[in-house]
Amino acid sequence: MSRPVRNRKVVDYSQFQESDDADEDYGRDSGPPAKKIRSSPREAKNKRRSGKNSQEDSEDSEEKDVKTKKDDSHSAEDSEDEKEDHKNVRQQRQAASKAASKQREMLMEDVGSEEEQEEEDEAPFQEKDSGSDEDFLVEDDDDSDYGSSKKKNKKMVKKSKPERKEKKMPKPRLKATVTPSPVKGKGKVGRPTASKASKEKTPSPKEEDEEPESPLEKKASSSPPPEKSGDEGSEDDAQSGED
């Protein structure tokens, strides 16, 4: 590949050639031209950046100062507001406590007045019913005495029961007493019938409790009956058959 040929301009330096005197005059009149130091593009960029950064830093610092001032003002306002709020809350609490205490006092006064009225109303009723109340108390005492009397009666009944049992205990039967009967024929003693003997043998418990035994009967019971002869026994059998 062949490279393209560049266009080149031909410069004629003859046009710019002047006399030596002119050069000398020019050199005397004007001093050597001051050379300007060209700064590299990197340095220019750095300067621009540094300038921008400095401006940004200054703006940031100003904004920060403004913010700090605002914050200080806000904090002062907030502190004042908080103080006022605390004061308001305290005042509200104090007012609520005072109102509650007043309500309690009013209620206590109302209750006390009602109780006084009730006591005044109940006083005449109590005076009227005092006698009946005493009677009622006496009746209560009577009831208590009645309960104690019941207990005493129960104790007495319990004590009397064993005595009755002792009375009911069977006593030894008394032996039949032999009494002489009127003579029927030939002047001989007749023997009592079996029915009479049985009646005499079984006395009633009432009679046993009421009538004490006589000493004669005890002696007769202790002595054995007399023995009879054979003739008397036959006569007794005949009499029982006739009956």
UniProtKB/Swiss-Prot annotation:
Assembly behavior: Does not interact with RAD51.
Compositional bias of kind Low complexity: 91-100
Residues annotated with Phosphothreonine modification: T179, T202
Entry's transmembrane regions: none
Residue list for modification Phosphoserine: 14, 19, 54, 58, 61, 73, 75, 79, 113, 130, 132, 144, 181, 204, 214, 223, 229, 234, 240
GO molecular function, one term: single-stranded DNA binding
InterPro entries the record matches: HR_DNA-Binding_Protein
Protein name listed in UniProt: Nuclear ubiquitous casein and cyclin-dependent kinase substrate 1
Key words of the record: Chromosome, DNA damage, DNA repair, Nucleus, Phosphoprotein
Gene Ontology terms: biological process: double-strand break repair via homologous recombination; interstrand cross-link repair
Disulfide-linked positions: none
Compositional bias (Basic residues): 35-51, 149-174
Principal location listed in the UniProt entry: nucleus
One GO CC annotation: cytoplasm
General function of this protein: Chromatin-associated protein involved in DNA repair by promoting homologous recombination (HR). Binds double-stranded DNA (dsDNA) and secondary DNA structures, such as D-loop structures, but with less affinity than RAD51AP1.
Protein localization: Nucleus; Chromosome
Phosphotyrosine PTM positions: Y13, Y26
Region called Disordered, residue ranges: 1-243
Modifications after synthesis and translation: Phosphorylated in an ATM-dependent manner in response to DNA damage. Phosphorylated by CDK1 and casein kinase.
